[in-house]
């Protein structure tokens, strides 16, 4: 079986009010999701921000490489247009705004 076990999303920014932004919650726009009821499937799914850094790090069961991951979880819907909120283990860096996030198709709730 080949194919990816994740769908594409864009990190749109942080949860915010008019004057304050809360960096502990990220807003994600999932590709192909345009209504609030369509986000129901993605709630509880794991998400990952994959990026490359300057130095190698040891990967379990593999060679050291420059790839790193920040893991998170989709927590709830945001608005009526298919955006979702996600919490990551460490807050996403601001340079990640506009970049790709992987929303994994697990754990399954079906």
Curated annotation (Swiss-Prot):
<comment type="subunit">
    <text>Component of the large ribosomal subunit.</text>
</comment>
<dbReference type="GO" id="GO:0005737">
    <property type="term" value="C:cytoplasm"/>
</dbReference>
<comment type="function">
    <text>Component of the large ribosomal subunit. The ribosome is a large ribonucleoprotein complex responsible for the synthesis of proteins in the cell. Required for the proliferation and viability of hematopoietic cells.</text>
</comment>
<dbReference type="GO" id="GO:0005840">
    <property type="term" value="C:ribosome"/>
</dbReference>
<dbReference type="InterPro" id="IPR038661">
    <property type="entry name" value="Ribosomal_eL33_sf"/>
</dbReference>
<dbReference type="GO" id="GO:0022625">
    <property type="term" value="C:cytosolic large ribosomal subunit"/>
</dbReference>
<dbReference type="Pfam" id="PF01247">
    <property type="entry name" value="Ribosomal_L35Ae"/>
</dbReference>
<dbReference type="GO" id="GO:0002181">
    <property type="term" value="P:cytoplasmic translation"/>
</dbReference>
<protein>
    <recommendedName>
        <fullName>Large ribosomal subunit protein eL33</fullName>
    </recommendedName>
</protein>
<keyword id="KW-0963">Cytoplasm</keyword>
<feature type="modified residue" description="N6-succinyllysine; alternate">
    <location>
        <position position="63"/>
    </location>
</feature>
<dbReference type="InterPro" id="IPR009000">
    <property type="entry name" value="Transl_B-barrel_sf"/>
</dbReference>
<dbReference type="GO" id="GO:0098793">
    <property type="term" value="C:presynapse"/>
</dbReference>
<dbReference type="InterPro" id="IPR018266">
    <property type="entry name" value="Ribosomal_eL33_CS"/>
</dbReference>
<keyword id="KW-0689">Ribosomal protein</keyword>
<dbReference type="GO" id="GO:0003735">
    <property type="term" value="F:structural constituent of ribosome"/>
</dbReference>
<dbReference type="GO" id="GO:0006364">
    <property type="term" value="P:rRNA processing"/>
</dbReference>
<keyword id="KW-0007">Acetylation</keyword>
<dbReference type="GO" id="GO:0140242">
    <property type="term" value="P:translation at postsynapse"/>
</dbReference>
<dbReference type="GO" id="GO:0045202">
    <property type="term" value="C:synapse"/>
</dbReference>
<dbReference type="GO" id="GO:0005829">
    <property type="term" value="C:cytosol"/>
</dbReference>
<dbReference type="GO" id="GO:0140236">
    <property type="term" value="P:translation at presynapse"/>
</dbReference>
<dbReference type="GO" id="GO:0098794">
    <property type="term" value="C:postsynapse"/>
</dbReference>
<feature type="modified residue" description="N6-acetyllysine; alternate">
    <location>
        <position position="63"/>
    </location>
</feature>
<dbReference type="GO" id="GO:0005739">
    <property type="term" value="C:mitochondrion"/>
</dbReference>
<comment type="similarity">
    <text>Belongs to the eukaryotic ribosomal protein eL33 family.</text>
</comment>
<feature type="modified residue" description="N6-acetyllysine">
    <location>
        <position position="8"/>
    </location>
</feature>
<keyword id="KW-0687">Ribonucleoprotein</keyword>
<dbReference type="GO" id="GO:0042273">
    <property type="term" value="P:ribosomal large subunit biogenesis"/>
</dbReference>
<dbReference type="InterPro" id="IPR001780">
    <property type="entry name" value="Ribosomal_eL33"/>
</dbReference>
